[in-house]
């Protein structure tokens, strides 16, 4: 009998028998065999392919029976040796993230080979993400600059160097950001001298339309909402301090205010 087999490799052994009695018909059968083997009674072929779960020793008993019911048994053990299997990934990647919100996904793996040590690594990740190779945690918080799609590849490597990779894309959706004012107010003016200051603003959200307005200003000043120009000439009656509040509003209604005082000297 063939008493050795290798995991994932086809095994075959043909039982043959003879009988000294001329004319006896011999019947072949398998009395005991593991489930991964099949036996062809017509040909005597015992065959099958063991899996990782079949690694170890398996008892087999084959029998030949003659016309008068006399039998001969062949009992033996087949030892299935292990072949290293690649690890497998058992977690489903989280492929959506939101700007300014914490993203996390735990990369989980397994290996059918008992005692294999698995090493986790990040092959490709965007800069806003970090990967903990001890726990498999991929985490981070994307900013407005990270809105869009980001390629990620995570890898698991077993003791013998076999690997499995999980490649996916994380799509970061935008959250509207308030605009910011980028200009510094002019806080002094002189009587009878033209005063001017241009409000400028920016928004990190591409495509946002910014609307400029004056919430509070003295009467001697005018504000051009199209250009952001605050201008005017104070008279003697305007000598003193004047409160001003200018505002920028984005497409979604978020605002930024600039409040300051203009001191008019005599």
Regions found by a protein language model. Name each.
Residues 56-60, 148-152, 240-244:
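Exposed beta-strand face motif in extracellular beta-rich ectodomains
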Residues 1-27, 76, 85-119, 168, ...:
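Extracellular ectodomain surface segments
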Residues 70-81, 162-173, 252-265:
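C-terminal edge beta-strand
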Residues 45-55, 137-147, 229-239:
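Extracellular/luminal low-complexity segments enriched in Ser/Thr/Pro
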């Amino acid at each position: 009998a063939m008493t050795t087999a290798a995991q994932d490799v086809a095994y075959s052994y043909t039982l043959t028998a003879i009988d000294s009695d001329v004319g006896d018909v011999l019947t072949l059968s398998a009395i005991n065999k593991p489930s991964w083997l099949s036996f062809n009674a017509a040909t005597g072929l015992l065959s099958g392919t063991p899996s990782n779960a079949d690694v170890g020793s398996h008892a087999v008993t084959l029998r030949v029976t003659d016309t008068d019911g006399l039998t001969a048994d062949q009992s033996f053990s087949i030892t299935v040796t292990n072949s290293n299997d690649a690890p497998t990934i058992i977690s489903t990647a989280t492929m959506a993230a939101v700007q300014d919100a914490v993203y996390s996904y735990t990369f989980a793996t397994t290996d059918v080979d008992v005692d294999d040590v698995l090493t986790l690594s990040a092959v490709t990740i965007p800069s806003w993400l970090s990967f903990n190779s001890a726990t498999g945690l991929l985490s981070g918080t994307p900013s407005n600059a990270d809105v869009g799609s980001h390629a990620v590849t995570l890898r698991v490597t077993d003791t013998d160097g076999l690997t499995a990779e999980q490649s996916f894309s994380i799509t970061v959706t935008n959250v509207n950001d308030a605009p910011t004012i980028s200009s510094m107010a002019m806080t002094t003016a002189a009587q009878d001298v033209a005063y001017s200051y241009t409000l400028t603003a920016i928004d990190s959200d591409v495509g946002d339309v910014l609307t400029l307005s004056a919430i509070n200003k003295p009467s001697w000043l005018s504000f051009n909402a199209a250009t952001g120009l605050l201008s005017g000439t104070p008279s003697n009656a305007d000598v003193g301090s004047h409160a001003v509040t200018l505002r920028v509003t984005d497409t979604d209604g978020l605002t930024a205010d600039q409040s300051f005082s203009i001191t008019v000297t005599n």
